[in-house]
Amino acid sequence: MNPLIFIIIMFTLILGTVITMISSHWLLIWMGLEMNMFSMIPIIMMKSHPRSTEAATKYFMTQATASMLLMMGVIINLYYSGQWTIMNSLNPVTSYMMTIALAMKLGLAPFHFWVPEVTQGTQLTSGMILLTWQKLAPMTILYQIHSSLNLNLMLTLAILSILIGGWGGLNQTQLRKIMAYSSIAHMGWMTAIIMYNTSLMMLNLVIYLMMTITMFALFINSTTTTTLSLSLTWNSTPILTTMLLTTLLSLGGLPPLSGFAPKWMIIQEMTKNNMLLLPTTMAIMALLNLYFYMRLIYSTSLTMFPTTNNNKMKWKYKTQNFIPLSPTLITLSTMLIPLTPMMLILN
């Protein structure tokens, strides 16, 4: 891709998200989402391949449907209230329509089918943008309208997302699909807590973004896309593989790593609100995610992979071109747990 065109596309992508995040007018918010969507399509199609074309088509159809549903909700709300402002309380019909539209944009279950397919059809860099930056605009809208949303609908979407995110990743061998299902599960945790504590949702989002960017940065650095190629990285880049596997454990929410902190605080907050069954169910379902992360770690570092590893240990390891800020991201993705008391005070 021409560097100038790439810069314009990236600028439009960032501008679209920023417009959505700072606007209080529904028309501007919708315009920002559209800019975001149309700039993401060429990023997905950056590699000229039938899989990337298919992924871009699926992404466009899903996002266009969600945008249409969101605009329909905005128009109905305008008809009843006569106002375009986002701070205005929504009527029940509009609330349901907007929740479903934003669930489609975020990839929440049962509107999740496009996320693994689109992520698998793109390059690692495009997949990273899709699972991190593209979550910001819809989550900002949810943050602003959370008081008008239906609690039962949000909790249903959250439980389904955590369940599907765990089940879907169990039989996967492609790392991009595993990351996609992990994203669905994490979005479920954020959706569950947004109705009770928006600060916790933001904290969860920030930690999720750090862990996901770290994982993709390490995948890009080691050119790893499957569980088989991941098992072979141990021979050439053992330090990088160790960091990758530690970040995987953090992504699964294993204490004492960073990923445990948001889950711990979400369960605590929901228990304070006299909800015991729901956080217990969420914690049990999160074990599915941890299981397939542990399976990756087991096959990579503790045993030989089912196919014989013929790669010999090298006397001189590869010189890795580290992505900028990788050491910082790895540290933040794995060692934030001592700051948890401070986070609890802030919340």
Swiss-Prot record:
Report which gene this protein is encoded by: MT-ND2
Say which enzyme class the record assigns: translocase
One Gene Ontology molecular-function label:
NADH dehydrogenase (ubiquinone) activity
EC annotation from Swiss-Prot or TrEMBL: 7.1.1.2
Name listed for the protein in its UniProt record: NADH-ubiquinone oxidoreductase chain 2
Question: Which Pfam families does the record match to this protein?
Answer: NADH_dehy_S2_C (PF06444), Proton_antipo_M (PF00361)
Query: Would you identify the family this protein belongs to, as annotated?
Result: Belongs to the complex I subunit 2 family.
Species this chain originates from? Dasypus novemcinctus (Nine-banded armadillo)
Reply yes or no: does the keyword Transcription apply.
no
Q: Which reaction does it catalyse?
A: a ubiquinone + NADH + 5 H(+)(in) = a ubiquinol + NAD(+) + 4 H(+)(out)
